[in-house]
């Protein structure tokens, strides 16, 4: 494991938090501004040191050309989610897809294998890989990954005006709307759909 100076660790932490918040790495100028460096060149020197130690990879010629090693193996592919387990639990990961997380915006934290045709009319088909950004912050109309009790589902999100009821809307008339009463249901938002990958037709 690489050993970092305090300042290098601060730069690395900033890169990670910026990617998590925005989906892409910071520029040299943004790093310099947030950490109080005199210039972007000072940030560049810290980035080069981090790259030498293997903490990051630098992509030449790009203002945001910074990659974290953990993103290089690709995005975790989640198959069936075992009841009660966190989505990214090791036993749920079937594989890694060789697509950089920042291919999507916001960045994808995992790919979820779609089961069924309830979202057909939104262009999401059985067997598709849904790119998901881990967040609990969603708005009406977003396509979300939601957990109800121990079941995980992909639906369009709608919060009723009373704020006590959530509707999860299918995009296929053959499927029923799921209505969730937040006062007595174990419900959570696991993530936001940010794209799909279709491996075969």
UniProtKB/Swiss-Prot annotation:
InterPro entries: LexA (IPR006200), LexA-like (IPR039418), LexA/Signal_pep-like_sf (IPR036286), LexA_DNA-bd_dom (IPR006199), LexA_repressor (IPR050077), Peptidase_S24_LexA (IPR006197), Peptidase_S24_S26A/B/C (IPR015927), WH-like_DNA-bd_sf (IPR036388). It comes from the Bacteria. GO terms for molecular function: DNA binding; serine-type endopeptidase activity. One of its GO terms (biological process) is DNA repair. The record marks 83-84 as: Cleavage. The keyword Repressor applies. Residues 28-48 bind DNA. Keywords: Autocatalytic cleavage, DNA damage, DNA repair, DNA replication, DNA-binding, Hydrolase, Repressor, SOS response, Transcription, Transcription regulation. SUPFAM superfamilies: LexA/Signal peptidase (SSF51306), Winged helix' DNA-binding domain (SSF46785). Homodimer. Belongs to the peptidase S24 family. This is LexA repressor. It comes from Saccharophagus degradans (strain 2-40 / ATCC 43961 / DSM 17024).
């Amino acid at each position: 494991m690489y050993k970092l100076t305090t300042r290098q660790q601060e730069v690395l932490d900033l890169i990670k938090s910026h990617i998590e918040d925005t989906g892409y790495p910071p520029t040299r100028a943004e790093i310099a501004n947030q950490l109080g460096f005199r210039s972007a060149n000072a940030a560049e020197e810290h980035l080069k040191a981090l790259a030498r130690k293997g903490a990051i990879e630098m992509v030449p010629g790009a203002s945001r050309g910074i990659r974290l090693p953990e993103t290089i193996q690709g995005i975790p592919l989640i198959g069936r989610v075992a009841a009660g387990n966190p989505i990214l639990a090791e036993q749920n990961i079937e594989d890694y897809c060789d697509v950089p997380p920042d291919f999507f915006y916001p960045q994808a934290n995992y790919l979820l294998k779609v089961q069924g045709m309830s979202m057909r009319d939104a262009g999401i088909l059985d067997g598709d890989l849904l790119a998901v950004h881990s967040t609990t912050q969603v708005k009406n109309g977003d396509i979300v990954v939601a957990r109800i009790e121990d079941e995980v589902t992909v639906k369009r999100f709608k919060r009723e005006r009373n704020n006590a009821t959530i509707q999860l809307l299918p995009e296929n008339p053959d499927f029923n709307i799921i209505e969730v009463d937040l006062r007595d249901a174990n419900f959570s938002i696991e993530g936001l759909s940010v794209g799909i990958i279709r491996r075969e037709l």
